[in-house]
C-alpha cells in the first residue's frame, strides 16, 4: 500500500509500528501493547490510540521528528502531479536524517499529513499492512 493513501486504522497501525508498539486488531479497534520503554504499562485501546485526531499523541512525534506542517494552496511534485488545498508535511533537515529519503505528504488534516510524512520517513513510500488491519479499515 502507498503510504500516501494510508488512512484511518491503517495509518494508526503504521504510526504505532513506527513508535515501537506491537498493534493487533480486534473488532475494528487497534489494540496496542505497552510501549517498549514502559513494559509494565497497560495496553492502550481504540480511541485513546488515535494519532490522527489526538494532538497529545501526535504532537510529540511532530516535535521530536521536526516535521514541518502547513496549508498548501498549490504544490507540484517532482512527477508533475499538482496538489491544492491540502495540509502538507515534510521532515525538517537535521543531521539525523540527512542521508534518509526525503518524504513529503499531504492530508485533509494537519495530523494526517504529518503522520503520513512520519511513516514514509521511517518505512518508505510503500508499506505492507496485515490483511486483518486492511479488512477492518
Could you describe each region identified by the protein language model?
Residues 1-137:
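Glycine-rich anion-binding surface patch
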Amino acid at each position: 500500500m502507498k503510504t500516501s493513501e494510508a488512512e484511518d486504522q491503517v495509518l494508526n497501525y503504521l504510526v504505532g509500528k513506527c513508535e515501537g508498539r506491537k498493534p493487533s486488531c480486534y473488532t475494528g479497534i487497534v489494540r496496542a501493547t505497552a510501549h517498549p520503554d514502559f513494559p509494565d504499562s497497560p495496553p492502550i485501546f481504540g480511541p485513546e490510540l488515535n494519532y490522527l485526531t489526538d494532538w497529545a499523541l501526535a504532537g510529540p512525534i511532530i516535535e521530536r521528528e521536526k516535521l514541518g506542517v502547513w496549508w498548501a494552496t498549490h504544490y507540484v511534485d517532482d512527477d508533475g502531479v499538482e496538489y491544492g488545498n491540502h495540509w502538507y508535511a515534510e521532515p525538517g533537515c537535521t543531521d539525523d536524517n540527512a542521508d534518509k529519503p526525503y518524504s513529503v505528504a499531504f492530508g485533509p488534516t494537519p495530523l494526517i499529513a504529518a503522520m503520513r510524512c512520519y511513516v514514509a520517513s521511517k518505512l518508505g513510500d510503500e508499506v505492507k499492512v496485515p490483511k486483518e488491519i486492511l479488512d477492518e479499515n
